[in-house]
Amino acid sequence: MKTAEIRRRYLAHFEANGHAVVPSAPLPAISDPNLLFVAAGMMQFVPYFLGQQTAPYKRAVSVQKCLRTPDIDEVGKTSRHGTFFQMNGNFSFGDYFKDEAIPLAWELSTKPVDAGGLGLDPDRIWPTVYLDDDEAFQIWRSVGVPADRIVRRGKADNFWSMGIPGPCGPCSELFYDRGPEYGREGGPEVDEDRYLEFWNLVFMQFERGPGTGKEDYPILGDLPAKNIDTGMGLERMASILQGVDNLYEIDEVRPILAKAAELTGKRYGAHSGQVASESHPDDVRLRVVADHVRTALMLIGDGVIPSNEGRGYVLRRIMRRAIRSIRLLGWQERAMPELLPVARDCMSASYPELATDFGRIADYAYAEEDAFLSTLRAGTTILDTAIAETRTAGRRAISGAKAFQLHDTYGFPIDLTLEIASEQGLQVDAEGFRRLMADQRARAKADAQARKTGHVDLSAYRTVLDEGGPVTFTGYQEVSRESTVRAVLGAASPHAAAVEGETVELVLDTTPFYAEGGGQQPDLGVITVGGGQVEVLDVQQPVPGLIVHRARVLRGEVRVGETGFAEIDTDRRRAISRSHTATHLVHQTMRNFLGESATQAGSLNAPGRLRFDFNTPTGVAPSVLRDVEQQVNEALLADLEVRAFVTSLAEARRIGAMALFGEKYGEQVRVVEVGDYARELCGGTHVGRSGQLGLVKILSESSIGSGVRRVEALVGIDAFNFLAREHLLVARLAELYRVPSDQVAERVEQTVTQLRDAEKELEKLRAQLVLGGAAALAAQASEVRGVAYVGTEAPEGAAGNDVRTLAQEIRSRIDPARPAVVAVAARANGKASLVVAVNPAARSQGLSAADLVKVAFAGRGGGSPELAQGGGLPAAEAPGLLRTVENAIAGA
């Protein structure tokens, strides 16, 4: 059975059982900025599972395109790993649970092929259930599985969870016995090569708390609603039904591999009989080509284009690995024009848009190959020379400088250098490479600071520094002082005068102004020089040792050599200092609760507020966040002395002062300690005692990237004002609801529940209105070239799922033996949309819903051959869309 047919049967089975067919989300994880790609079938439904949004349907089915990026380096080395895959899934949002999910899965798996099922032998299916899930065990018994083929497994294998806190619950997996030629008998506990897992049914019913690993966490209670999330790997099922060993042998992948073998003159599996080798370089490279070309096709098809960052870099890396692999197999010409059309033909049965959009996809793919071949030619020559020189010198590692030159000058990726060196039995000085990269980033950071001050060229700053030496910062001890103007930058020349209205950069010999750095915002204030005065707008350190004041001349003029009086905004300084000390306390307290891995990844110390980024593998539970906040404020109440002192780096480490990962420190460092509570290396300004902070209020905790979390908080009077506003709000709500303050939350929840119930009732009424005329419309179907055609506009206000439901309802009321096409147009928000539904009898005559929609929308729109939709035209075009579909049928 072909992969596309398995896909179709899966969707049809669940659609027939009341599930809405939901199209795959695009591969880029657009809805989650913390992820590059969708990696699971349930990701587009996460807001529904978490209760953040109300699902527009109670049950859904989809085939989701997924990408697994951690496997890139393993792809090809075994026949088990691939990057792109498809995940069949059926989902319930508070509708059905185990008693329906298990029979639905069993029915599709075991129903004969000629009856629309997958035709698996029921005697070869082994379900697993969670240890104490007697309910699931009994349901499996009720569908006919003998007790000795139902395996109970522990939390690590059969209990699923997502997020902390988050939903969790037991799961039940279905394994298929591939036969004695694949291993020992005895079920999945004995041999998971012979017994292949092909479907996982997750029963979400509990909420989990914080913990470590797959087993060590508490169950906090029941979820408000029980949900179902299942996943069947489409490629895995295809390998079972097609009687092949792995995904590289199925019909959507093997033709690409075969084409690569044809081009290179290699035979897949030639080195180990009829079965492909797991380790022979030829078979490894053929698998790399097959997987990566298919993945590149799907990524570009979903809008990703090659680049040097994010998703585009993943695509570039995948394409370059495929291109280099086929060149190592002996093919020296352009490979993408030969391979990409084969991948398109393999995948377009399920994704017809790949065929219609192939011109654009090919343009990007072919251009990327051309660019890489140029890079490869230049870089390979340099690398070959480096390899030869390394061997001649008797060394085992290519220098970091050479790897950096390849990367920086020739655009040769470091991962490719590492891979080629490994193939030649050599290593690469990765530490030296990283050090040179860090130096380059530091230079880029300095240039960015210079651009912020308006000077891309740092030479003027270096000249001032060389002529007068470093600027002395006195801001730790004083907030104002007499200073001499050393340079005026941004005027006609470094030694010219700045006049009223000009914005320039001033360099003083000494200054109390703190330059932005270490997450702390700069001081602001005024400088009075003779009869003139300037307002300091920003303070930066574009090159180490030189403090530059960006300032606007308010009156008079400022000349080099004049003596003036520099005075910072003390209210701002005190507010920033409070925030900075608070950040130290938050950092230490996070480590107290989360462990030493909770290291700082970034910060912002601004007047009255702070932002603290830290590394941690998991989120922070609300209860932990409350404890952190309480402990921080207890440190304020203790009124601990804040002390700063300079010592050696070795001594600072000995006394346990925290240093920021990646920062460079000199031999002498400044340590800031808050009593015995917190101790860090820090160059910022702080309060004298912790009690001066007044109050710290944590506002939020969120993810800003993989393994990086962010806490935001208010400090001092800003925290007090926030709580005062919150108090007034609660008091106002209590007054409106006429209840005590501690009952406001309960009353709000009741109101929200009532609103949701009312929305559900409105949804039911709207559905009744929309579907009420389905029977009459079906009875009025016209005849177009032997096809029953219904073209109608949906009732006013109907949109989205309502229109799809109406089209399917009309289709279901037409005699299934009669070819039928239903087109329903709708008008909403000034736009016209169209849903087309086609029954199997019409499909057998070559009619496709997706094709008809593309005709109506000039190539746009999408969906399956049975159900498709499009939109975006002006509302007045709705009748014309119906006529276009009718004309397309007439001309078919």
Curated annotation (Swiss-Prot):
Primary location group: cytoplasm
Biological process (GO) annotations held by this record are: alanyl-tRNA aminoacylation
Provide GO CC annotations from the record.
cytosol
Q: Where does Zn(2+) bind?
A: 580, 584, 682, 686
Q: Which Gene3D superfamilies match?
A: 2.40.30.130, 3.10.310.40, 3.30.54.20, 6.10.250.550, Bira Bifunctional Protein, Domain 2 (3.30.930.10), Threonyl-trna Synthetase, Chain A, domain 2 (3.30.980.10)
Q: Which domain of life is it from?
A: Bacteria
Report the function annotation for this chain.
Catalyzes the attachment of alanine to tRNA(Ala) in a two-step reaction: alanine is first activated by ATP to form Ala-AMP and then transferred to the acceptor end of tRNA(Ala). Also edits incorrectly charged Ser-tRNA(Ala) and Gly-tRNA(Ala) via its editing domain.
What does the record's free text say on domains?
Consists of three domains; the N-terminal catalytic domain, the editing domain and the C-terminal C-Ala domain. The editing domain removes incorrectly charged amino acids, while the C-Ala domain, along with tRNA(Ala), serves as a bridge to cooperatively bring together the editing and aminoacylation centers thus stimulating deacylation of misacylated tRNAs.
Question: Which family does the record claim for this protein?
Answer: Belongs to the class-II aminoacyl-tRNA synthetase family.
Q: What is this protein called?
A: Alanine--tRNA ligase
